[in-house]
């Protein structure tokens, strides 16, 4: 009896100790998808563990916790969610898998989530919402009694991130250190050459006194996804200087797993280039076994830089849109678990402010799939205008709420959102049947599109796309463009200039051609499928065949050809320059447009500037921009230097299929020499940006597939011979297993119809027996799945 009583007493004591175990305000790490969650308490009970959560929902968002949610301890064991019943006053009942809306009046609420009981000796655990790869979570939830329960510490006077004390390494002074010693009160860091001694004092008013190599400073731990707001104002302005230089970005990637390594984990950088237009530059570097990396980033001034911690072909674990300056040195932390990214250094304030998520609630204005009438375009454009006004109001409210936020942060966001709205509105021109915006929008665009002389020209990437769209829009409206396309208004414009005389019969034919164009436009707006569009379009062409013959006869007249070549010369890019001279004559816009015209010509054609375009160089008044364009021209002048023999060895003559007209017969003849091998068919064009981007990166794919006996068959669509050879040489597509053809248009079209292409690039696999297999153009980005497809081929 005494033994039973003793056991009962011990059990009661154990239950009592459970009931008293509560973590108040435990430390934890937020990941990218949980920045609005805060753990106020953790209750440990013998039959359950309870998480008490405060939820903030910016812009009236909702929250959902999956019924698959669980707690996870360091040994890998999981403890499932069992309910969401309120246990305290002020909490709301919650049912897992349902949507939880916070109060409309204060945008926050409180709930309690119950889980299977954690072990009594638990010191740290994770809360993970489901098993999806990007499920949100609260990680490293740690007993607050542990002094170093949060690894990240900031200087309370300056707001800067000073120290990261992680399990395996430390981050201090923009470097990664190993531990020579680590206790709750003393840490010694070493890099093998230098030691840093850190002593940690007692907590007082949320701070601890750290002594780092004899220097004392008050630090406070933080666990938010981004740094807390800075305590002092910063009125520094951006430098507007245009200059070339490299920013050096070093960093540390935490919580890398073997799976990440196997999936080609890397750092990828994208930077806009205002000289080259809407073409982002890309730079990549590897991450070493400790998680460290360094990359040099060429810049043209203070500008936006997009940083991605990527794996596989296109997946990314963390990302940051930041601003860097030539010759600047920066350090960034990327965490694979929490998705956190933070900057450390003497001049990292702007970079950390830009990582805040609170300002990112930008409403989407909408897009139009396919062609639309002007009324529909205006409706979407007005939504973008309304949303821009909302954006400005949000920024004003944000500035009032956070008076210490830096001037550069606000200046950038105002500028970026302005050009973001302009770019998205201008992009709606692609939904118009004549590729131009309704005139009703020109006033708003003109009013809001001025270049701010107090901001760096190269700062925002949206300015690159906006300028290109604006130039294209003006070009499409130009009579020169209509002349270039031999449209009715082009003939009438030549007549108005006294350069062409038209007969009554020719005027009648031009009037009929205008009616034909109206019918075509109405057909495009009808939303018919591709087959029906072709059928009806052919009927319209038959209906107006007689007037088309008259117009064709005009184009064969010598007076027309003389006027045409005088006004249009080298085609689209020459016409663009004429339009820029009349529509955008003021600096610096004129120089930017001229730079982009020449750069885009070379990128599109993959060849140096023609004689008709070289004089445009003198119109570029910004010396650095002109120098960059000239370097690009020299690159294409010398692109085949030393490569002619290799290129000629892999290009094949179209005479191989001479006389064949059937698409299947032509393709069978092309692949006949490679029976018994897998053929990877790539249908591309020198004019196709996505095609060239994939070709540029194709060597990585080929390296991954080196164990397969693959022949890479490249068929170029509508590609000038010089451009075609230049692309082959530029991207070194000259391996022995590469085969290149530039077939006559009819034969190329026959193959494309046979393989049923829907766009460019198009990829197909031809198995060892000659069977044709369809591929989506992104299928090769999932390598394990793609290799499985190859393994299953006969």
Positions of PLM-derived features:
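Conserved redox-active cysteine motifs that mediate thiol-disulfide chemistry
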Residues: 675, 683-700, 717-719
């Amino acid at each position: 009896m005494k033994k039973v009583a003793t056991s009962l007493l011990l059990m009661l004591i154990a239950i009592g100790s459970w009931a008293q175990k509560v973590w108040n305000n435990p430390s934890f790490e937020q990941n990218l998808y949980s920045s609005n969650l805060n753990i106020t308490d953790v209750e440990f009970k013998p039959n359950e563990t309870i998480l008490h959560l405060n939820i903030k929902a910016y812009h009236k968002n909702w929250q959902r916790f999956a019924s698959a949610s669980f707690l996870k301890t360091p040994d890998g064991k999981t403890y499932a969610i069992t309910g969401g019943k309120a246990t305290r006053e002020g909490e709301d009942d919650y049912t897992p898998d349902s949507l939880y809306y916070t109060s409309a009046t204060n945008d926050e609420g409180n709930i309690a989530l119950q889980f299977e009981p954690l072990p009594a000796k638990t010191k740290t655990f994770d809360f993970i919402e489901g098993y999806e790869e990007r499920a949100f979570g609260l990680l490293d939830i740690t007993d607050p009694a542990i002094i170093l329960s949060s690894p990240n510490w900031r200087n309370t006077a300056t707001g800067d991130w000073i120290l990261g004390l992680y399990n395996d390494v430390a981050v201090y002074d923009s470097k990664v250190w190993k531990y020579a010693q680590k206790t709750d009160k003393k840490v010694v860091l070493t890099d093998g050459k230098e030691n840093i001694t850190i002593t940690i004092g007692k907590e007082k008013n949320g701070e601890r006194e750290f002594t780092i190599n004899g220097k004392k400073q008050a630090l406070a731990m933080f666990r938010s996804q981004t740094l807390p707001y800075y305590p002092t104002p910063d009125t520094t302005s951006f430098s507007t200087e245009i200059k070339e230089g490299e920013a050096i970005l070093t960093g540390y990637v935490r919580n890398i797993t073997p799976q990440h390594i196997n999936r080609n984990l890397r750092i990828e950088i994208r930077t806009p280039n205002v000289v080259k237009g809407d073409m982002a530059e890309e730079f990549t570097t590897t991450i070493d076994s400790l998680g460290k990396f360094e990359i040099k980033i060429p810049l043209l001034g203070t500008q936006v830089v997009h940083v991605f911690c990527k794996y596989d072909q296109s997946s990314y674990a963390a990302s940051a849109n930041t601003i860097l300056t030539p010759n600047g040195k920066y350090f960034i932390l990327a965490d694979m678990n929490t998705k956190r990214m933070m900057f450390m250094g003497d001049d990292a304030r702007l970079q950390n402010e830009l990582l805040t998520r609170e300002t990112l609630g930008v409403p989407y204005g909408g897009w139009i799939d396919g062609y639309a009438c002007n009324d529909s375009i205006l409706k979407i454009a007005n939504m973008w205008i309304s949303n821009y006004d909302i954006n400005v109001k949000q920024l004003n409210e944000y500035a009032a709420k956070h008076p210490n936020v830096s001037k550069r942060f606000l200046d950038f966001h105002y500028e970026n959102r302005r050009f973001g709205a302009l770019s998205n509105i201008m992009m709606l021109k692609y939904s118009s049947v004549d590729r131009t915006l309704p005139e009703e929008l020109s006033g708003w665009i003109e009013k809001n599109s001025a270049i701010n002389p107090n901001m760096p020209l190269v700062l925002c990437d949206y300015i690159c796309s906006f300028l290109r769209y604006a130039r294209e829009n003006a070009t499409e409206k130009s009579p020169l463009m209509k002349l270039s396309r031999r449209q009715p208004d082009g003939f009438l414009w030549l007549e108005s200039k006294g350069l062409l005389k038209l007969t009554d019969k020719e005027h009648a034919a031009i009037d009929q051609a205008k009616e034909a164009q109206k019918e075509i436009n109405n057909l495009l707006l009808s939303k018919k499928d591709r087959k029906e569009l072709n059928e009806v379009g052919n009927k319209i062409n038959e209906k107006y065949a007689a007037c088309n013959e008259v117009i064709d006869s005009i184009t064969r007249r010598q007076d027309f050809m003389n006027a045409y070549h005088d006004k249009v010369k080298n085609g689209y890019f020459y016409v663009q320059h004429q339009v820029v001279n009349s529509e955008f004559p003021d600096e610096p816009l004129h120089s930017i447009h001229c730079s982009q015209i020449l750069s885009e010509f070379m990128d599109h054609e993959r060849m140096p500037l023609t004689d008709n375009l070289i004089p445009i160089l003198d119109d570029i008044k910004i010396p650095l921009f002109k120098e960059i364009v000239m370097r690009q021209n020299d690159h294409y002048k010398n692109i085949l230097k030393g490569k002619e023999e290799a290129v000629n060895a892999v290009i094949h003559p179209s005479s191989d299929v001479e006389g064949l007209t059937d698409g299947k017969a032509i393709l069978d003849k092309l692949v006949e020499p490679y029976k018994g091998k897998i053929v990877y068919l790539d249908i591309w064009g020198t004019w196709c940006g996505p095609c060239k981007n994939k070709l540029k990166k194709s060597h990585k794919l080929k390296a991954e597939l080196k164990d397969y006996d693959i022949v890479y068959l490249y068929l170029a669509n509508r590609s000038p011979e010089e451009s075609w050879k230049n692309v082959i040489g530029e991207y070194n597509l000259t391996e022995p297993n590469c085969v290149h053809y530039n077939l006559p248009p009819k034969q190329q079209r026959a193959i494309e119809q046979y393989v049923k292409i829907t766009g460019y690039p198009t990829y197909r696999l031809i198995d060892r027996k000659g069977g044709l297999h369809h591929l989506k153009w992104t299928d090769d980005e999932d390598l394990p799945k793609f290799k499985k497809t190859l393994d299953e081929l006969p």
